[in-house]
From Swiss-Prot:
Cofactor: Mg(2+)
Binding annotation for Mg(2+) 1: D9, D144
Subunit structure: Homodimer which binds Holliday junction (HJ) DNA. The HJ becomes 2-fold symmetrical on binding to RuvC with unstacked arms; it has a different conformation from HJ DNA in complex with RuvA. In the full resolvosome a probable DNA-RuvA(4)-RuvB(12)-RuvC(2) complex forms which resolves the HJ.
GO MF entry, a single one: magnesium ion binding
Classification via Gene3D superfamilies: Ribonuclease H-like superfamily/Ribonuclease H (3.30.420.10)
Cysteine disulfide links: none
Protein name listed in UniProt: Crossover junction endodeoxyribonuclease RuvC
Active site, renumbered: D9, E70, D144
Cofactor note: Binds 2 Mg(2+) ion per subunit.
Amino acid sequence: MSYVALGVDPGLLRTGWAVVEYDGLCNVRYIDSGIVKTASQGSLSARLEKIHRGISDVIEKVNPSVAVLEKVFVNNNPYSSLNLAYCRGALILTLALKGLFIVEFAPSVLKKRITGNGRATKAQVKYMVEQLLGLDPCLSKYSDLYDALALAASVTRYDIMEAKGT
């Protein structure tokens, strides 16, 4: 059974998204990816609306079977953490309104699945994603896009069944 996974790396300034397809034999193929950018001077509501519309457009275009998000983490800057939480909330609502099952990974779990090391660097994640999906190293300058690719490439049928509660 094949399925299409949408990976989304939330960010109020840049939200990365990526779509991959799995065939029934555990092979993964790159479909598309991109970044939804917002203006840093814009209002919070306008920025969240732009992210909502951008991801909604992607969903309409590719009709994914499942969505994969990175779990929120709290960093040293509470303002940044709060903005990330707003963004995740808007994304979860967008995905739920589109009827998608959502699988979530902690950053360390994602890194472990992609590189074998839960403390991998952004460069290591980027390299392994390029190798796994056969991508051009110059695809994007944004780590947000590579994180979204890693998310999409990491989800398994088992994760989907677990998210569905079956």
